């Protein structure tokens, strides 16, 4: 589980997931996202979140935690070993507050995969950007999104029932 997403103001520190709201970091369980009608939750600590969402099937003390200290201390062998030893659908929590943290984690993840380990991943866009080697690009312009020579349409998927998503959708619908 790696919900770090710099562009969306999402950070995980000491296993607690935070959302940047203006100049404050708010524990995710205290934000409007936690009250989403489709997938509400109360826990900001990701181990507790796992326990809550699995209705106790997976316990927070059984999760594997990858700390910022391990990542920033470049303890690659130690992290890789943790990943290799994880079994029985064990939940792995990745702390990250910067893309460098995710990049270091991905080195260890790739090492574990090369050692024969398989993973099912739940993450924000940052992990897929790093593992895929996708470069940062500016936001797409209208010219990049719409080709006036074609009558093909487009698809916009809105995936959350929160005020912020509704405001973003409204802004999109009001634009040319």
Outline where the language-model segments fall.
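Cap/lid and interdomain-hinge subdomains that line or gate substrate/regulatory clefts
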Residues: 1-102
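Short acidic, glycine/serine/threonine-rich loops at helix termini
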Residues: 10-18, 103-108, 132-136, 167-170
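Conserved active-site and cofactor/substrate-binding residues in soluble primary-metabolism enzymes
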Residues: 41-45, 74, 97-104, 122, ...
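A generic secondary-structure signal
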Residues: 53, 81-82, 108-111, 171
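A C-terminal functional module that forms or caps the active site or interfaces directly
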Residues: 73-79, 106, 114, 133, ...
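Active-site pocket-lining segments that scaffold enzyme catalytic pockets across diverse folds
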Residues: 90-122
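Acidic, glycine-rich loop-and-beta core segments that form the ion-binding/anion-interacting portion
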Residues: 111-176
